[in-house]
Amino acid sequence: MAAFSEMGVMPEIAQAVEEMDWLLPTDIQAESIPLILGGGDVLMAAETGSGKTGAFSIPVIQIVYETLKDQMEGKKGKATIKTGGAVLNKWQMNPYDRGSAFAIGSDGLCCQSREVKEWHGCRATRGVTKGKYYYEVSCHDQGLCRVGWSTMQASLDLGTDKFGFGFGGTGKKSHNKQFDSYGEEFTMHDTIGCYLDIDKGQIKFSKNGKDLGLAFEFPPHIRNQALFAACVLKNAELKFNFGEEDFKFPPKDGYIGLCKAPDGNVVKSQHTGNAQVVQTQNLPNAPKALIVEPSRELAEQTLNNVKQFKKYIDNPKLRELLIIGGVAARDQLSVLEQGVDIVVGTPGRLDDLVSTGKLNLSQVRFLVLDEADGLLLQGYSDFINRIHSQIPQITSDGKRLQVIVCSATLHSFDVKKLSEKIMHFPTWVDLKGEDSVPETVHHVVVIVNPKTDKLWERLGKNHIRTDEVHAKDNTLPGANTPEMWSEAIKILKGEYTVRAIKEHKMDQAIIFCRTKIDCDNMEQYFIQQGGGPDRKGHQFSCVCLHGDRKPQERKQNLERFKRGDVRFLICTDVAARGIDIHGVPYVINVTLPDEKQNYVHRIGRVGRAERMGLAISLVAKEKEKVWYHVCSSRGKGCYNTRLKEEGGCTIWYNEMQLLGEIEEHLNCTISQVEPDIKVPVDDFDGKVTYGQKRALGGGLYKGHVDILAPTVQELAALEKEAQTSFLHLGYLPNQLFRTF
């Protein structure tokens, strides 16, 4: 409890954590919890089972609770934006004179719009009528923006009418929809100075202190109106300085900061906000935190963690809701109407509720994307961008949206690209590093070569049912076509899977198949062997886990496998991602994954907690034709066996190439074993019993200590000598002075 409390975790959560036997935080928790509690965006990567869920759930629960507590007690917090006339007494950007997607920070100076298709603008709370004035704008990112001056009559789209004058990052000045080249381009980290001489009717700009020359001369009718600092943004962030802080590049020639304008020359904005107060009341269907998971199982797992962590939180109690498909939406809507604080869900149902207005995102403080690489792999990039654009970047109480991204690896280009788009200067917490295979995992490859192993010809019809990719092809022995070899590979892989189970007397394993139909076919083949879901204790007892199974069935199947009621879990990558399954002694890859990172995810499920594990991958020597659905139905009812480039839904799958990429990625050569799948005794580890701890673990460590012992003794002697010399030097000055 003390260990978590030292990180700033509230006692109620620390007590719940202690009851879960979490005496010390894991590495990812120790790094991430303080960062999130401190208000930052965090990108975290660590192995599955390392405590990532706790690393984001604990601080999210605490901050949501503190926010609700403050609201209940009537506190507005240090960062609350003032309303009504109070806003107009300060030089800042006006929250009541801005576009719908334009966010203003608690200081009134930091501004942001994350709308990527439309421009959204804003004006300052006060304008000037006489004199020479200056303000600065700092660019915080690489988005598009225009800054300058406008009257109260001007459009918020600065520079598109005769009442506004703007200077844009593309090096163009704009007035009345006329865009002319001026100065030079500017972008992130640049500071733009905006000069206004009302008496002469002149406007000019500077970049990082460099005067860019006269930009506009405005007509007399403009001089009779108050001019306000203004900007317009598209997916950009700026910070204004009206002179209350020291300017980076102080103006010369008699220009002064706007905040020093004499009262007689200052006019307050007509937009006072008296009828437009930013909504602060709590809506029942507006949660404070949204956690997005790639699968139902992972969402349920995360929700259970949230329930455990909030166990002792009271006054106010936190209300959580699981939003997933396959469950009656009516039940979820009734809970939403009663009020929720934390929502955990999967993209499909979340998208439905958000698009219909049933789930309101206006008060979200936290957006958590768990297993982000999995979400992107499933094609949810547009969904993520869509919901992010609907969440205010700064809430009504002045707090900034925090985005937390968890991924099995941060070395994915897509994850990096996403973080640059939706996160605000995120801190990277990468405790995983480059992919590597744990020492407790033996992984081997079995080459499936139908040209040398003719077993498939002798089986007749007594083989695994295949995926019907070759339903219209001639695959009979003797055809000698790529289609025949492909069908033979599918048959042999079913036989090799059964052979591996018998050879190693597997009592528990995860079997990864590439598609949902492959999973179903493997389950059916195990039933033909006398096993299946209802044969508890049988050598081939199994359950199936993939997206087409009903949620309740998936949940029950997972629990049955965890309890040991069945020996084998047959699943796809997507269904198994992030599921908390420990200590499985065997994994069989019926087909290599097309993403090399997924190979490490799969085999990383064995050999945990110092227990040895064996991962067997069946790799086709020839190319295999497989389903690759690009149709709108995502494979349901699709039998288009033409290749993708011909408008169909199949591809030729080259596992030998994938194997090469995996070996290059891991910087190692994976051992190959014969089709009899007998794994030779390792010269280093000796005879290994998979699922049990390494017999030589302690001995190896002891040997390592013996090797280091002489060096450590030498180091101790040197340390003693250094300390003694230091003590002698301490007395030396006094002795020297005595001699004189």
Swiss-Prot record:
Keywords, ordered alphabetically: Activator, ATP-binding, Cytoplasm, DNA-binding, Exonuclease, Helicase, Hydrolase, Mitochondrion, mRNA processing, Nuclease, Nucleotide-binding, Nucleus, RNA-binding, Transcription, Transcription regulation, tRNA processing
- Where are the residues of the annotated region Interaction with dsRNA? 1-448
Q: What subcellular compartments does it reside in?
A: Nucleus; Cytoplasm; Cytoplasmic granule; Cytoplasm, Cytosol
Question: Which positions does UniProt annotate for ATP binding?
Answer: A46, E47, T48, G49, S50, G51, K52, T53
Pfam families cross-referenced by the UniProt entry: DEAD (PF00270), Helicase_C (PF00271), SPRY (PF00622)
**Domain B30.2/SPRY stretches:** 70-247
Top-level enzyme category: hydrolase
Q: Which domain of life is it from?
A: Eukaryota
Where is the motif named DEAD box mapped on this chain? 370-373
| A single GO cellular-component term on record | cytoplasm
Q: What is its main location?
A: nucleus
Gene3D superfamilies from the xrefs? 2.60.120.920, P-loop containing nucleotide triphosphate hydrolases
Instruction: Give the Enzyme Commission number.
Output: 3.6.4.13
**Matching InterPro entries:** B30.2/SPRY (IPR001870), B30.2/SPRY_sf (IPR043136), ConA-like_dom_sf (IPR013320), DEAD/DEAH_box_helicase_dom (IPR011545), Helicase_ATP-bd (IPR014001), Helicase_C-like (IPR001650), P-loop_NTPase (IPR027417), RNA_helicase_DEAD_Q_motif (IPR014014)
Q: Which reaction is catalysed here?
A: ATP + H2O = ADP + phosphate + H(+)
Q: Which residues form the Helicase C-terminal domain?
A: 493-681
What's in the domain note? The helicase domain is involved in the stimulation of RELA transcriptional activity.
Its biological function? Acts as an ATP-dependent RNA helicase, able to unwind both RNA-RNA and RNA-DNA duplexes. Possesses 5' single-stranded RNA overhang nuclease activity. Acts as a positive regulator of transcription. May be involved in 3'-end cleavage and polyadenylation of pre-mRNAs. Binds DNA and RNA. Component of the tRNA-splicing ligase complex required to facilitate the enzymatic turnover of catalytic subunit RTCB. Binds (via helicase ATP-binding domain) on both short and long poly(I:C) dsRNA.
Return the similarity comment. Answer: Belongs to the DEAD box helicase family. DDX1 subfamily.
Q: Per its record, how is this protein called by name? A: ATP-dependent RNA helicase DDX1
Q: Which organism is it from?
A: Gallus gallus
Gene name tied to this protein: DDX1
